[in-house]
Amino acid sequence: MNIGAITDKGLVRKTNQDAIFSKVSPDNKIGLFVIADGMGGHYMGDLASNKIIQEFEQWWLRFEVAEFNKTDSECMDELKEVLNEANSYIYINYSRDKAISGSTIAVLLIYDKKYYMFNVGDTRIYMIDKNGVNLITVDHTLRTELENKTGVTETDIRNNPKRDALTKAVGTKSDISWHETEGMVEGKRFCICTDGIYKFVDDELLKKILVSHSSPQKICDKLVQLVLKAGAYDNYSMYYICPENKKQDGRTSAFCCIALLLIAIILFIIFR
């Protein structure tokens, strides 16, 4: 797999309440990618996001000990249970009086030829393929709820000061539900990012960069440049994943073609 990654506190926040985690199996067939965004300004937001990541790290260690001998459905069942356990721990241990601690989460599991994902909150996963860029997560925000209500206009939503408030997060309630989907990996790339990325970049420009043929890390770096230019007053985190490990840089492909051509010419001269 070819992967780009970045996380930072931004230009204004004193701490980074985002937490990220990724691991790939030795045979390059299984990859787990997780981003958690602690609820900004809330009590113990950084502890919530870090606790989530710790739980998924522990799961991967157990997976390694088992020599990756689990089916994809077994992995997903266990990962969802990990999320349930993290939710219970945060709700019981990090909530004090009326203070609420919580975090968003987006999880992507690449398992051989298939992908699986689930999310809570507004951390997003974009899927990139020959048809363009598609959002495969659901934002659990007031905006989303209002958009699904009849009679509510875009102006109404834009004028609502709480439009970006989360309606779901890990650790804010005793139980938790999530959005999930799955599909085939072939021909697809993925971008996981917090709102510190996508809220600071024009949507059309974001999509243009995501479909570009730059390397995964260059794509991350390009988006971060735009975030910094826009002020970066939130933490930001991102993964860009090419599961099929195909180089996205056209110049690299051209170089390989030229190199092969030169080798062929040399062999022809030697053995003619």
Which role fits each region the language model picked out?
Residues 1-272:
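PP2C/PPM-type serine/threonine phosphatase catalytic domain
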